[in-house]
Amino acid sequence: MDYKKLLGDIINAIPQPTASNNKRRTSAEVCYKIQQIAIKVSHPFQTFRDQRVYSYTGKYWVSIDDFDLKIFLREALGRMTNNMVEASQREVVEGLFKQFPYTVMGLAVEQNKEKINFLNGTIDLKTERLEQHLYSDYFRYVLPYPYNPSAMCPMFMKYLDRVLPDKDTQKVLAEYIGWIFTPLKLEKCLFLYGSGKNGKSVFVDIVEALLGKENISHESLSDMCGENGDRSRANLSGKLLNTCSDVAPNAFSGDIFKRIASGEPISTRQLYKDVATLTDYAKMIFCLNELPKTNDKSNGYFRRFLIVPFKVQIPKSEVDPKLAEKIISTELPGIMNWVLEGRERLITQSGFTESSLCQKQLEEYRYGSGVRKKVNLILPDGFKL
C-alpha cells in the first residue's frame, strides 16, 4: 500500500499553531502529540517487535520506511510550529526519529491466526462469519481481493491436474499454503523440485498473487543461513511467505535452516539498528532445479523437507505464457477456498496428507538411488555416503 496518503491525512489533521499552543516542546511531547492526532483520525502508530514503526490503515498495519518516517516527522513538526526551517534541522529530525518508536511502542502482539484478513472484512475461521476490520487483530497484511465462500477455480484446477496429477500431492500444496493461517508447529519447508517447463513457476506466481506481492519476501537459503544471514532474515518480518528460485544452493548452515523451518525465534538485524528477535515470520517455498547440497546428514535436517516433484514436462505446443495471468485475474477467491479446505484438513489431521511422491523424492534426496540408497539405508547417521 502507498501509505503516503495516510501520513498526509495525519499531517492535515494537525491544528495550525496559535500564540497559546506554539510553545517549544520536547521531542517526547511532539511525538506524543502526533500519536494522539493519529489515533483521532483512526491511523494510530505502533512499534512492533521487529523494531519497525507501523501505522494502521483501517484494514491492516503497514510498516513505515525509515526515510519516509523522517519526512513525516519533519512535516508534522513544521505544521505544529509553522516553522519548517527549525523543523528541518538535522538534530531536530534525528531527535524525533529516535524518540518516536519509543513513544508508540506497544505490547508485542502476534497476528490472529484464527482469522484471515480480506479486502471486504475479516473472516473468523471458528464461526465462519465475516467481521469488520479491527486494529486489535494486528494484521500486517490484507489479501488483495474480497472473501467469497462460493467462488470456484476451474482453470486453476485444470492446470494443477495437468502439471501435478497426483491428488494427494495436490492436497499437500493446499495444506502448506493453509498452514500460513494456523498456529500449528509442523516444521517444514516446501521445495518445488524439477527441471524447466513443468509448471512449478506458474504455481509460485499464482501463490504470490494469492497472498499479495507486498506480503512476500524473496530471500535465498544461502543468504538467510549464511555469514550475514541476520540482515537477510530481517526481511521475513511481517511477511506471509518467502519464495525464491535457487538454481543450485550451496552448502549452508543446517542449524539456522532447521530453526527457520521450525518457526523458532530467529535473530535479525536491520542496517543501523539493534539485533531483534523474530517469532512471527514467513513460511518458505523454494523453486529448485537442484536440491540443496548439505553436510548435515541428520534426521533433524531431512525431516524438515517437504519436496513436491514436478515431473510432467509440458510440450512447447501446450505452453501458455499468460496462463498464470489468466488464472490470477479471475480465480483468486476460488483458489483461497481451495486453500481453506486444505487448512481445515491440515488441522483435522494434525499434519500434512501423506503423499507417496513426496516421500519417495525425500528418500532419494536423503539416501540417493540404486546401490547408494541400499548402502545408506543400513549406515547410521554420520556415516552415510
Tell me what each language-model feature is.
Residues 1-50, 77-385:
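Feature primarily recognizes SF3-like P-loop helicase cores of small DNA viruses
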